[in-house]
């Protein structure tokens, strides 16, 4: 049983995937998109460290590890034009419109901003998926990848708790996946209350909330079987 709020729940490593949401330079490194857009990323380094430890345990326990990278083609066709709400609400797109010298640099595949942070390089057997909107289920292969492997439980880490983490967990709930977020392996985009609100939403309506210590304590002694 994995200790969690609002109650502990059974988690079988063979049917569990750890989802790493958007641990890219854009969201976790100084000079990345979130930093340039004025968001506080001071907690990102600790989150990176926590995720690294979680992934070591997850792999040893035989869990599937899935990395997401958020962004678009270098021409931003996938981002949508003015006819898309994403064009209006994406802070990356708004930042580039306000600062034309950044055009083509933020969240574009092939650019430093898009790449995963150095400390979270995927290992052999890990899966890497691309997404173009907040939810990892939108226009991606995630659902088919999970179903093909018999995955029923998703453990979420990454940035930002209140945006892409929560969006993906919510969509997973609608598709009958059990979702748990490791609260100290996530970081919000915005003030501290946003993190608390997102975690409240998750544990009350859409899933469960646990910690990296409880995850590692539950699965750290397991070997794949």
From Swiss-Prot:
| Residues at the active site | 22 (proton acceptor), 131, 164 (nucleophile)
**Keywords of this entry:** Hydrolase
EC number in record: 3.5.1.110
The record's listing under CDD domains reads:
cysteine_hydrolases
Q: Pfam families in the record, alphabetically?
A: Isochorismatase (PF00857)
Q: Which Gene3D superfamilies match?
A: Isochorismatase-like
Q: Which InterPro entries match?
A: Isochorismatase-like_dom (IPR000868), Isochorismatase-like_hydrls (IPR050272), Isochorismatase-like_sf (IPR036380), RutB (IPR019916)
Top EC category: hydrolase
Q: Extract the GO molecular function terms from the UniProt entry.
A: hydrolase activity, acting on carbon-nitrogen (but not peptide) bonds, in linear amides
Q: What does it catalyze?
A: (Z)-3-ureidoacrylate + H2O + H(+) = (Z)-3-aminoacrylate + NH4(+) + CO2; (Z)-3-ureidoacrylate + H2O = (Z)-3-aminoacrylate + carbamate + H(+); (Z)-2-methylureidoacrylate + H2O + H(+) = (Z)-2-methylaminoacrylate + NH4(+) + CO2
GO annotation, biological process = nitrogen utilization; uracil catabolic process
Q: Which domain of life is it from?
A: Bacteria
Family in the record: Belongs to the isochorismatase family. RutB subfamily.
The function of this protein is: Hydrolyzes ureidoacrylate to form aminoacrylate and carbamate. The carbamate hydrolyzes spontaneously, thereby releasing one of the nitrogen atoms of the pyrimidine ring as ammonia and one of its carbon atoms as CO2.
Protein name in the entry? Ureidoacrylate amidohydrolase RutB
Name the species this protein comes from: Caulobacter vibrioides (strain ATCC 19089 / CIP 103742 / CB 15)
Q: What's the encoding gene here?
A: rutB
């Amino acid at each position: 049983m994995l200790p969690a709020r609002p109650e502990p729940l059974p988690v079988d490593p063979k049917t569990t995937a750890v989802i790493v949401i958007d641990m890219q330079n854009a969201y976790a490194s100084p000079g990345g998109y979130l930093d340039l857009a004025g968001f506080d990323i001071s907690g990102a380094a600790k989150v990176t460290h926590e995720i690294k430890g979680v992934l070591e345990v997850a792999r040893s326990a035989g869990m599937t590890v899935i990395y997401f990278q958020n962004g678009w083609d270098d021409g931003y066709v996938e981002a949508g034009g003015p006819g898309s709400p994403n064009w209006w609400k994406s802070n990356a797109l708004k930042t580039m419109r306000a600062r034309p010298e950044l055009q083509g640099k933020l969240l574009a595949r092939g650019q430093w901003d898009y790449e995963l942070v150095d400390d979270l390089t995927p290992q052999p057997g890990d899966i890497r998926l691309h997404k173009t909107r907040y939810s990892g289920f939108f226009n991606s292969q995630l659902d088919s990848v999970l179903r093909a492997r018999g995955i029923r439980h998703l453990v979420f880490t990454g940035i930002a708790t209140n945006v892409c983490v929560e969006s993906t967990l919510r969509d997973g709930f609608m598709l009958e996946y059990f979702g748990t977020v490791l609260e100290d392996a996530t970081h919000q985009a915005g003030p501290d209350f946003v993190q608390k609100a997102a975690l409240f939403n998750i544990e009350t309506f859409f899933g469960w909330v646990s910690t990296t210590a409880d995850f590692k304590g539950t699965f750290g002694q397991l070997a794949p079987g």
